[in-house]
Amino acid sequence: MADKKGSNSEKLLYCSFCGKSQHEVKKLIAGPSVFICDECIDLCNEIIRDEAAAAGVEASLSRSDLPSPQEIRDILDQYVIGQERAKKILAVAVYNHYKRLKHLDKKDDVELSKSNILLIGPTGSGKTLLAQTLARLLNVPFVIADATTLTEAGYVGEDVENIIQKLLQNCNYEVDKAQRGIVYIDEIDKISRKSDNPSITRDVSGEGVQQALLKLVEGTMASVPPQGGRKHPNQDFIQVDTTNILFICGGAFDGLEKVITDRTEKTGIGFGATVKSKQDRDAGEVLRDVEPEDLIKFGLIPELIGRLPVVATLGKLDEAALMKILVEPKNALVKQYHKLFAMERVELEIRPAALQAVARKAIRRKTGARGLRSIIEQALLDVMYELPTMKGVSKVIIDENVIDGDGKPLLIYEDTPKVAGSN
């Protein structure tokens, strides 16, 4: 091994790969008539790691032991509470999709079509989390796109091919990996056309975007600028085939239940008519009856609906489900805050009544599971601010009064209880 420090009388040595001298690098390792520096070794290690990761993804999607629908469902259960029917639908759809990719090279008379997925459910019901968990389970590139930021090509805003650009960025521009990834398009309901009749006016963020998404979802060669640059003439583009990318579209579809109810519960006229209350059925139950015609009436174009054949509906989360979400999943919020407080060598206790108060508040705000963190963060703000400078605190207790804003956390100083903020 040659050290970079040497006397002037010694012959100057150079790296055989990058050409740097022994004085420009930390170490120069000698072989038979060849030298390699520490920087080139690091670069080689990085290349090997990347290729091993790519091979691992390829193997995970082509191996015979692809997770079964039941195994996929079991893993989803660890992260997502409730939504049993939606998890079953997703497990089968994703299993069939990657099973189809395994058999692409086999010549057969029967060609298997791609089954993209549409998730319908209220805010905070777990749509995004389901898609994220699936991507993590399958170890494939994943990207979330917001449909409300998309516009038709030529207008100010993001065009649909930016979605593929983000997917490429997430896998270091490895095209083969990107072509087997998962794209989640959120707020798909926000780009519905304003009426169920085709408009004669330009709708740059509605029907026009749906038409542009249609090509991407069904499979096309997307042209993406290299390394995230903007498109301009005389530029080489990266070509990405979207045929085998799994697209999952999600949205709250507020008002869709009324469209379904109007179709399914036609009311009669006269004394013999059956009068049904539209409040008799839960919104989640109503959404299960969704048909393509309802989505068309809501404002999605028929062609796009046809490219999203798998429809899974998610129900509104009740108080019991929200309480479970707080404590049961692997990355449950309460477990996260326990860990944060443990870093300060303090035990955190959130009492069951406090969890119930958090769930009730989230229901009142109509934010679902998404609003749970902000409620807990607000309740713990003062104590998290003061705790790092406090001495001798061993435990913090949170009850329902803290969540409702009527009290402060109880601090345990060795054997003496004390209220936060009191002197």
Swiss-Prot record:
Q: Is the keyword tRNA-binding in the record?
A: no
Would you tell me the Gene Ontology cellular component terms?
HslUV protease complex
Sorted alphabetically, the Gene Ontology BP terms of this entry are:
cell division; proteolysis involved in protein catabolic process
Cited Pfam families: AAA_2, ClpB_D2-small, zf-C4_ClpX
Write down the superkingdom of origin: Bacteria
Share what the entry says about its subunit structure, partners included: Component of the ClpX-ClpP complex. Forms a hexameric ring that, in the presence of ATP, binds to fourteen ClpP subunits assembled into a disk-like structure with a central cavity, resembling the structure of eukaryotic proteasomes.
**What does this protein's UniProt record list under function?**
ATP-dependent specificity component of the Clp protease. It directs the protease to specific substrates. Can perform chaperone functions in the absence of ClpP.
What this protein is called in its record is ATP-dependent Clp protease ATP-binding subunit ClpX
* Native organism: Burkholderia multivorans (strain ATCC 17616 / 249)
Q: Which gene encodes it?
A: clpX
